[in-house]
A protein has these predicted regions:
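Acidic (Asp/Glu-rich) catalytic motifs at the cytosolic membrane interface
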Residues: 70-100, 203-227
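Multi-pass membrane catalytic core of lipid/isoprenoid biosynthesis enzymes
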Residues: 92-136, 225-256
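Functional transmembrane core segments of multi-pass inner-membrane proteins
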Residues: 51-62, 169-216, 220, 234-235, ...
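Membrane-embedded alpha-helical segments that form the functional core of polytopic membrane enzymes
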Residues: 46-84, 136-150, 189-210
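Intramembrane alpha-helical segments
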Residues: 22-28, 100-188
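Small-residue-rich segments of transmembrane alpha-helices in multi-pass membrane proteins
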Residues: 40-51, 166-183, 228-236, 288-308
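Extended hydrophobic alpha-helices typical of membrane-associated regions
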Residues: 235, 259-321
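Haloarchaeal acidic low-complexity proteome signature biased toward cell-envelope/secretome components but also
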Residues: 1-32, 289, 321
Length: 321
């Protein structure tokens, strides 16, 4: 039926237009894939790897693009798996409720179909890189990344295996973004790669910790037994400050003033957050961190600073290794 203006109505409510529905589905797809969060910092990870490799030849751009897209797709399908599995829990968490709503917009079956499609295409790209190079390493990396993403939300649920969760998720980010790229482009991993990788691992470990700390109040109510819930919000942020401060020290030793300044700034900011939340009640702690901290923005800034520093000053790394 229609009202006087010609708007379609069901039960007295105007129905959204086709274009509105398309936009809603597109945005929901981006949200369940966490693209607004992961796209920037994963691109920056890739650039760190390119810098450590000493650049990329024009002939290798297609392989690098295939590899990078494969990483993004396999990580994205893991985000969908987590969104579907934790939909009820996320509904109660203001910082994640939009993800739960996005799952509802898509529907569970459509979300799972998208997951399978991304997984197949992503692994196919890893296979393509392995075929082109004659090295099974890249397909193995893709398979390991897919398993880690699945196990994050489903048994053995890495998110509930204490600090092992952060070691695995941070390691997966850093290995796929920083370690494998030089192997793809040069065939080797130099000592300088290991030094840069250690710095990146430390600050990435830090922002993974703070990201989880923001959910402690809601995880407790949902009985999700995370590392941050076990040790407490403030202490988790304190650990992040220590790890990021150590990364700043490595950046200084590497002769990267830009990365040093940004990483040290992040460490000092974490100290400020620690001081702010430590005497607050648990719910307020989660609210403060959710308001102040965005893992996408922080990770992109830190990785971009490191990428620029490595690309501009790679030759200086050899002086400390």
């Amino acid at each position: 039926m229609t009202d006087g203006r010609g708007d379609l109505r069901v039960s007295g409510r105007p129905q959204p237009s086709a274009s509105t529905r398309i936009v809603a589905v597109a945005w929901a797809t981006a949200k369940v894939n966490r693209l607004p969060t992961i796209l920037g910092y994963n691109l920056a990870y890739l650039l760190v790897g390119v810098g450590v490799a000493g650049g990329v030849a024009v002939d290798d751009l297609d392989l690098l693009a295939a590899y990078g897209l494969g990483v993004l797709l396999v990580k994205s399908q893991a985000s969908i798996a987590d969104a579907v599995h934790d939909r009820e829990t996320d509904t109660e968490n203001p910082s994640k409720s939009s993800v739960a709503r996005s799952v509802a917009v898509l529907g569970r079956e459509r979300a799972l179909s998208l997951l399978v499609t991304e997984l197949v295409v992503g692994l196919g790209l890893f296979g393509l890189v392995s075929t082109a190079t004659g090295e099974p390493l890249y397909l193995a990396v893709g398979g390991a990344l897919a398993l880690a993403g699945f196990w994050y939300s489903y048994p053995p649920r890495l998110k509930e295996v204490g600090v092992v969760n952060h070691l695995v998720t941070t390691g997966a980010d850093v290995v796929t973004g920083v370690v494998v790229v030089p192997v793809l482009l040069t065939g080797t991993v130099g000592r300088e790669t290991l030094v840069v990788t250690t710095a990146v691992f430390l600050y990435a470990f830090g922002y993974h910790l703070v990201h989880q700390a923001a959910d402690v109040y809601y995880d407790r109510h949902a009985r999700v037994d995370t590392f941050a819930r076990r040790v407490g919000t403030a202490r988790t942020v304190g650990y992040a400050a220590v790890a990021t401060g150590a990364a700043a020290g490595l950046c200084l030793a590497l002769g990267y003033p830009g990365a040093t300044a940004v990483t040290l700034g992040a460490a000092l900011w974490y100290v400020s957050l620690y001081r702010e939340v430590r005497r607050e009640p648990l719910e307020r702690q989660s609210e403060l961190l959710a308001d102040r901290f965005s893992v996408g923005a922080v990770a992109t800034l830190l990785n971009a600073a490191m990428a620029v520093s490595v690309l501009l000053g790679l030759s200086d790394v050899s002086t400390v290794v």
